[in-house]
């Protein structure tokens, strides 16, 4: 599964439908836990529902081919780059508590691209 930003640029992918999210350069950047997206530093980054990754304010950060339901208009998708060899995953830090879910927004988040995973 590929995660595209608000411009249709492929930023990251879910490795073999596992819980781990990688950038195309091979860097592991996050993982899914239930319906939440966490950084390896333990920070709760956002939510993954219906093919959308949303920030903590409910705004859309990424979409996938499977995105359904409410959200902003999806742009045309750019071609996916080749996937580089995956780097070793860092150890997961203790997860911070999940934030309360915000109402689902219909616009794009101001946080996008790789920056989302660096929080």
Residue ranges and their predicted role:
Residues 19-21, 37, 53:
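Hydrophobic residues embedded in beta-strands of well-ordered beta-sheets
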Residues 27-28, 44-45, 60, 68:
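Extracellular beta-strand scaffolds
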Residues 6, 24, 40-41, 56:
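Tandem-repeat architecture and repeat-register "anchor" residues
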Residues 1-31:
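N-terminal leader/targeting segments and the first structural element of proteins
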Residues 1-9, 50-119:
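Long terminal segments
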